[in-house]
Amino acid sequence: MTNVLFIKANGLPAERSVSVALYEIFLAEYKKSHPDDNVTELDLFEADLPYYDVTMMSGLHKEVAGETLTPEEKRLADIANGYLDQFLAADKIVMAFPLWNFSIPAQFLTYLFYLNQAGKTFKYTANGPIGLVTDKKIALLNARGGIYSDGPLQSFEMSLNYVKNVLAHFGISEPEMVIVEGHNAKPDQAKDIISAGAKEAAELAKIF
């Protein structure tokens, strides 16, 4: 059985969020097209995601070094490792997220920090880091109200680019993508822009 992890990185309802609308469309179509797959949903706005602070970092580093952790270090390290284990156990992963203030929501950033662990998702070598997660299929569903694919705001796009770079660091270099942009910049075209993205998400879900 194929294990599929759906990650939603937006707490708004679908009628107020294009990325959540894409998520729900993709999820519904995927379940319809792949009825035998084991689907797990992770809502990062409902999940327990402690801030990636010095105590958590210390605990994770002590684990690698084989040192004794304090109770709080162990508690936080266990949380991070729990999310990482879930990520690594999935055969396919779908991530839906917006561009907020040129970046990604803080909850999503924290989650990605949990995953970025040497010896688990990548390893250091004399020639630089090498990704260790090369066996996963990834779909990225990204929405941004402005135009960031080209033009004066291109260099400000640090949501999709950031996530793609993190995944490439893990060894996942060719994710599937559905990008919806410009629906706020071009309100007269918003309905058509969002409709086209929804159709693209549904079609990708069928073959993902």
Curated annotation (Swiss-Prot):
Binding site for FMN: S17, V18, S19
Record-linked Gene3D superfamilies: 3.40.50.360
Pfam families: Flavodoxin_2
Cofactor note as given: Binds 1 FMN per subunit.
GO molecular function, one term: electron transfer activity
Entry keyword set: Flavoprotein, FMN, NAD, Oxidoreductase
Catalytic activity: 2 a quinone + NADH + H(+) = 2 a 1,4-benzosemiquinone + NAD(+); N,N-dimethyl-1,4-phenylenediamine + anthranilate + 2 NAD(+) = 2-(4-dimethylaminophenyl)diazenylbenzoate + 2 NADH + 2 H(+)
EC number: 1.6.5.-, 1.7.1.17
Family assignment from sequence similarity: Belongs to the azoreductase type 1 family.
UniProt function note: Quinone reductase that provides resistance to thiol-specific stress caused by electrophilic quinones. Also exhibits azoreductase activity. Catalyzes the reductive cleavage of the azo bond in aromatic azo compounds to the corresponding amines.
PANTHER family the UniProt entry points to: FMN-DEPENDENT NADH-AZOREDUCTASE 1 (PTHR43741), FMN-DEPENDENT NADH:QUINONE OXIDOREDUCTASE (PTHR43741:SF4)
Record HAMAP family: Azoreductase_type1
Record's subunit section: Homodimer.
Entry protein name: FMN-dependent NADH:quinone oxidoreductase 1
Species whose genome carries this gene: Listeria innocua serovar 6a (strain ATCC BAA-680 / CLIP 11262)
Organism lineage string: Bacteria, Bacillati, Bacillota, Bacilli, Bacillales
